[in-house]
């Protein structure tokens, strides 16, 4: 079993299930005044990056430019809980249109009919593409992997 912190955990069945789920990610970042922020957000896993999208005027983009270190959690709320914890660096790219990964996320979250319909309402809208490169990965499944406080 891969150790907590290993990028190999991204291939674990728990990670794969959560990365393919319709659960929102929770993006944690540092605000301009140094305080922590957490926001729920749609995501798409490319196999290498967690990609988020945001309106180009979203305040979080300024904060990510100042400090690109982030944490992402994707979890479910059925016992036994499953949690994917990721730390990494966010790279923000401004686009003239909808991010391709946002289209994929919309289809996953809304379904094959409503997802493309939603994206079509956004066509031509500038969007920020936020690609997070994982540097640390952890999994909790409350069966074989527990929070570290329970194993001390």
Model-derived regions: residue spans:
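Short secondary-structure boundary/capping segments
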Residues: 16-17, 42, 62, 120-122
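Short, surface-exposed beta-strand-loop junctions and turns on beta-sheet-rich folds
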Residues: 58-60, 79, 146-147
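Amphipathic alpha-helical interface surfaces
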Residues: 15, 57-60, 98-102
């Amino acid at each position: 079993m891969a150790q907590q912190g290993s990028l190999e955990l991204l291939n674990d069945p728990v990670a794969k299930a959560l990365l393919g789920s319709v659960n929102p990610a929770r993006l944690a970042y540092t605000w301009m005044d140094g305080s922590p922020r957490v926001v729920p957000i749609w995501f798409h896993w490319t196999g290498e990056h967690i990609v988020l999208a945001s309106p180009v005027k979203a305040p979080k983009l300024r904060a990510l430019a100042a400090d690109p270190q982030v944490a992402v959690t994707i979890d479910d709320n059925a016992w036994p809980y499953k949690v994917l914890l990721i730390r990494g660096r966010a790279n923000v790219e401004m686009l003239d249109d909808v991010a391709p990964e946002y289209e994929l996320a919309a289809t996953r979250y809304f379904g094959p009919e409503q997802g493309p319909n939603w994206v079509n309402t956004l066509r031509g809208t500038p969007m920020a593409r936020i690609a997070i490169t994982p540097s640390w990965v952890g999994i909790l499944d409350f069966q074989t992997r527990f929070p570290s406080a329970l194993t001390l």
